[in-house]
Regions:
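Bacterial N-terminal signal peptides
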Residues: 10-19
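Compact beta-sheet-dominated domain cores in extracellular/mature segments
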Residues: 2-7, 21-117
């Protein structure tokens, strides 16, 4: 992990993310406390997770009026929603995570990974 990613993750944690559960383990979580993931099969900032995949891995969607650090951007999905990207990679939740701090999706299929500080 580069120093830029580490610095950005720290800024993001201070600005947007909660300090419960996943955050305490060095994993980034949304304000609702649910762990955030990236997918190795995505190409750049474009998601390749739709249909059945998106049911298991819901996109972390947002709007342009939300304020985020520089490493966080919005990318259009084919369904018209805007998905958050972190360091150029689309960001997801895992439907199998049931409680704040769960990270049951980490490493699944060798292609899903928790975003870590």
């Amino acid at each position: 992990m580069t120093n830029t990613i580490k610095r950005s993750a720290a800024v993001l944690a201070a600005i947007m993310f909660s300090a419960i559960g996943a955050q305490a383990a060095g994993m980034l979580a949304a304000q609702n406390g649910m762990t955030l993931y990236v997918f190795d099969k995505d190409k750049g900032d474009q998601s390749s997770c739709y249909d059945d995949c998106a049911k298991k891995w819901p996109a972390y969607v947002g709007t342009a009026d939300e304020k985020m650090p520089a490493d966080w951007k919005l990318a259009a999905r084919t369904d018209g929603t805007m998905q958050w990207t972190y360091d150029g990679k689309p960001v997801y939740f895992f439907a199998g995570d049931k409680a704040k701090g769960d990270a049951a999706g980490d490493g699944l299929g060798g292609v899903w990974h928790v975003i870590k500080e």
